[in-house]
Design a protein with these regions (language model features):
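Hydrophobic alpha-helical bundle cores within soluble ligand-binding/oligomerization subdomains
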Residues: 14-26, 30-273
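Cationic, low-complexity basic patches in intrinsically disordered or flexible, solvent-exposed regions
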Residues: 8-9
């Protein structure tokens, strides 16, 4: 009998916003009490609600995660405490397939992502033109849009996998180009896991990469899927509702995340860690 593989190996806040694309055609498997199938009133909407930026207004549900008072966040029924030390790749597999991978599936999924990781020609030329005083989230939005223009295939699943695979290198290059460290950039090592490719591109002096990989991997797993109602996820859904591409939707979500009332929470969490 096959056992599901809780791998203890060593990807960015943007992943949690992919739920609006990855699961819009899937049945609800994860909502506590199957909330989405119930016909129930959640809010008495008044004219006052129209002028408060949707504060306190339920705007979405999530098919992949839910929260309980005792165990906190669950991904597809698994308490986050059971997943925190697993590899980001295995959690991405979980969010796609609603179950953890076997050892064989884990290996094959990693190979799949590795085959998609190379950035298209033209990305670095675009990054080289951006103002160094620009906010990194603005750089990220431009980078995601550029990826879509250069390598989008207009298939939500393929584009999602491609974006996941390309983000570590893109984000590492964004840091380097903003800081002016554009010489001696290490080649992208596709044999490394996703987080390892990011830290390899950063190539920071005096940093224990093994420790950094472990911290970033756990951090990313913890932030990978947090429900359907936060600002960036809502924004991504709104853009996607017009049948925009995955890249346009994710860029819009990152623009929403850039504001201090939303993204600052992630930054403060990382500073705490």
């Amino acid at each position: 009998m096959e056992t599901r593989y809780p791998q203890q190996h060593l990807i960015p806040t943007f992943l949690k916003n992919l739920a609006s694309h990855l699961y819009r055609s899937y049945p609800s498997l994860c909502l506590d009490g199957d909330l989405m199938s119930e016909d129930k009133s959640l809010l008495d909407l008044t004219t006052a609600h129209l002028n408060i930026g949707l504060r306190g207004v339920p705007v979405g549900t999530c098919r992949t995660s839910y929260v309980t008072p005792g165990e906190g966040v669950h991904y597809c029924g698994y308490p986050i405490g059971e997943l925190a030390m697993m590899s980001p790749e295995d959690i991405v597999f979980l969010l796609f397939h609603k179950e953890l991978p076997t050892l064989e599936e884990s290996v094959e999924f990693r190979k799949n992502l590795q085959s998609r990781g190379e950035l298209p020609d033209g990305i670095e030329q675009v990054l080289a033109t951006l103002p160094k005083n620009g906010h990194p989230m603005d750089w990220l939005s431009v980078g995601i849009h550029t990826l879509g223009m250069l390598s989008g295939v207009d298939d939500w699943k393929e584009d999602s996998l491609n974006l996941i695979a390309k983000m570590p290198r893109l984000m590492g290059l964004i840091f380097r180009y903003r800081e002016g460290r554009v010489s001696n950039i290490p080649a992208d090592d596709f044999s490394l896991p996703l987080v390892g490719r990011f830290t390899n591109t950063l190539d920071l002096d005096g940093i224990d990469k093994a420790v950094m990989n472990r911290v970033l991997s756990t951090y990313l797993v913890l932030h990978m899927d947090h429900g359907g109602g936060n600002l960036s996820t809502f924004t991504g859904k709104a853009v996607a509702s017009g049948h925009a591409t995955v890249y346009s939707s994710m860029a819009g979500a990152m623009n929403a995340l850039s504001g201090p009332l939303h993204g600052r929470a992630n930054q403060s969490c990382f500073e705490f860690v």
